[in-house]
Amino acid sequence: MAGKGGKGLLAAKTTAAKAAADKDKDRKKAPVSRSSRAGIQFPVGRIHRQLKGRVSANGRVGATAAVYTAAILEYLTAEVLELAGNASKDLKVKRITPRHLQLAIRGDEELDTLIKGTIAGGGVIPHIHKSLINKTAKE
């Protein structure tokens, strides 16, 4: 009889463990955003919704298209902000203005070709033609 009692105790423990495991299965996991899964800051879900609204093929957009688009936008934003931050630091100012963005974008050849439009409040890039420079100032 002593042997049977031990088995019964073991069986009771396993059923309790199974019940606890079933209880864990019933619990819902916290939702994880697609942005955090991809390891980026830009909102993948919002970009996916925007892409679906703009496409003409019945709103069909692949799941990875939004992730790639968000990653590209995040990279370009970080690049522009880094250059604009350097421009504002050179001018000893703590706030980035449209002028700093203009100087950063026009100073980089690749960003200049990518962003050809006018930046409101950006001013103009300083440039003096060689023929206008005084000959005495050259020497």
Curated annotation (Swiss-Prot):
The entry's keywords: Chromosome, DNA-binding, Nucleosome core, Nucleus
GO cellular component: nucleosome; nucleus
Family indicated by similarity: Belongs to the histone H2A family.
Biased composition (Basic and acidic residues): 20-29
Task performed by this protein: Variant histones H2A are synthesized throughout the cell cycle and are very different from classical S-phase regulated H2A. May replace conventional H2A in a subset of nucleosomes. Nucleosomes wrap and compact DNA into chromatin, limiting DNA accessibility to the cellular machineries which require DNA as a template. Histones thereby play a central role in transcription regulation, DNA repair, DNA replication and chromosomal stability. DNA accessibility is regulated via a complex set of post-translational modifications of histones, also called histone code, and nucleosome remodeling.
Protein name: Probable histone H2A variant 2
The UniProt record lists the keyword Phosphoprotein: no
Region (Disordered) location: 1-40
Species this chain originates from: Oryza sativa subsp. japonica (Rice)
InterPro entries: Histone-fold, Histone_H2A, Histone_H2A/H2B/H3, Histone_H2A_C
Biased composition (Low complexity): 9-19
Subcellular location: Nucleus; Chromosome
GO molecular function: DNA binding; protein heterodimerization activity; structural constituent of chromatin
Swiss-Prot/TrEMBL GO biological process terms: heterochromatin formation
Top-rank taxon: Eukaryota
Description of how the protein assembles with itself and partners: The nucleosome is a histone octamer containing two molecules each of H2A, H2B, H3 and H4 assembled in one H3-H4 heterotetramer and two H2A-H2B heterodimers. The octamer wraps approximately 147 bp of DNA.
Pfam families named among the record's database cross-references: Histone, Histone_H2A_C
